[in-house]
Structures are given as structure tokens and as C-alpha cells.
Amino acid sequence: MDYAWTSTTFEMPGCHVVRNLGVVRGVTVRSAHLGSQIAAGFRSLGGGRIDEYVEMCEQARAEAFAIMTAHADQMGANAILGVRYDATELMQNMTEVICYGSAVVVEADAKA
């Protein structure tokens, strides 16, 4: 699936939905390794951005997104609309990230 065909909106200008295939999702659970936890702990004493956790969150979001798009491919979708992310702390330093949306088949609108 072309990542350009994913959107947080529920419509795509110049296209119309031919079929709605249902909800697709990607879920991952991440935990920072001990070295990152220690470095982040020291960095948090000074305040500001904690790069170790930012990197972990970005990797988790990217992985959840990739799993979601693979799920949409399996269903035969060529687009995903209404893409959203959510995160839940499962335990200390362990976070679940989910990416979800509506798998659809879209076609370009006919030119007038």
C-alpha cells in the first residue's frame, strides 16, 4: 500500500470510497532497555526533552503504522482513512501503542 493513501481525514479529495472493508489496526508494546532508562533518569533531572524516550515512542508509532498498513494490504485496501494513534502504559516503562483506521477501496473521481 502506498503510504500517501493514508489520512487522518475521512475523505480523500479527488477520490470516492468504493468499498469500506472495516477497521484495521497495528499494535506494538515497547519497553526501554535498562541503559536508556538510566540515561533518561539522569536527563530528566535537568528537565527538557528526553531523547531516549522520544526515540522509543517514534519507533513504536512507526511499527504500529507498518503493522496497520500490512493488515490493510491483506484485506485488499488501497487506502486507510481516519487514522488515529493511542497509547497506554501497561507497566512502568512498558507502553502499548495502537494505530487504527478504516480500510477502504477508493477510486479517482471521473473528470467532468
Please identify what each model-predicted range represents.
Residues 1, 12, 56, 68, ...:
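Detector for methionine-enriched segments
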